[in-house]
């Protein structure tokens, strides 16, 4: 009986995830299965495969704001989208308001994506040196300025990916999430680890819950 009850709840949870429609801005997401952006992996071919398995939303590899501003052809090609993968989000990263706005406008005007996502969660050193990704979590005012200016510059919904904090001494995901909401973002994704954890240890779902309750 207990096994049957457990199976029933598992199927019920899966049903809720698969059929519950989510809306991000003016974009309808048919279910709550969202493919996370992964550098070097989530190109157009990979995204199409994931779409065939029923994902509600797919997200591109992270795209450098500076590379778009400089007109790097290889980076521009990362904006390629197949008609079969909608809805799809293009994720950009950077640490400067002006270049992020310029990059977001380029994506808005030259890509047929449905959503523009801002990466404020990547913990790798190369991104941190560019004052981007989870580096930005140390500077809430800059987070607000980037999101607000990007939102105002584009016609598509803007979402933001964050972590719970830069390290265990500076967990500020609720504060950051409130600022992102105030800046006009349509949705927030939270990785339940700090920047210092990288991809190790356990994700702290309690902080994710706190963000969910706060915004």
Regions found by a protein language model. Give the residues of each.
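Short, positively charged and aromatic/hydrophobic N-terminal segments
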Residues: 1-8, 13-17
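Flavin-dependent oxidoreductase catalytic cores
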Residues: 15-215
């Amino acid at each position: 009986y207990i096994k049957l009850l457990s199976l029933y709840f598992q199927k019920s949870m899966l049903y809720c995830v698969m059929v519950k429609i989510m809306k991000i801005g003016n974009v309808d997401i048919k279910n709550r299965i969202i493919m996370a952006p992964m550098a070097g992996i989530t190109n157009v071919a990979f995204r199409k495969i994931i779409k065939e398995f029923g994902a509600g939303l797919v997200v591109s590899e992270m795209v450098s704001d500076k590379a778009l501003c400089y007109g790097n052809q290889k980076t521009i090609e990362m904006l390629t989208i197949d008609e079969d993968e909608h809805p799809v989000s293009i994720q950009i990263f950077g640490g400067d308001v002006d270049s992020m706005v310029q990059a977001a406008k380029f994506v808005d005007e030259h890509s047929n994506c449905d959503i523009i996502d801002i990466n404020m969660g990547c913990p790798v050193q190369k991104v941190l040196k560019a004052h981007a990704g989870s580096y930005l979590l140390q500077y809430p005012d800059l987070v607000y300025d980037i999101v607000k200016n990007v939102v105002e510059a584009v016609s598509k919904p803007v979402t933001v990916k964050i972590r719970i904090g830069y390290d265990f001494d500076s967990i500020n995901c609720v504060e950051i999430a409130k600022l992102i909401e105030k800046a006009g973002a349509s949705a927030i994704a939270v990785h339940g680890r700090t920047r210092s954890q990288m991809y190790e240890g356990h994700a702290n779902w309690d902080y994710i819950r706190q963000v969910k309750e706060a915004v």
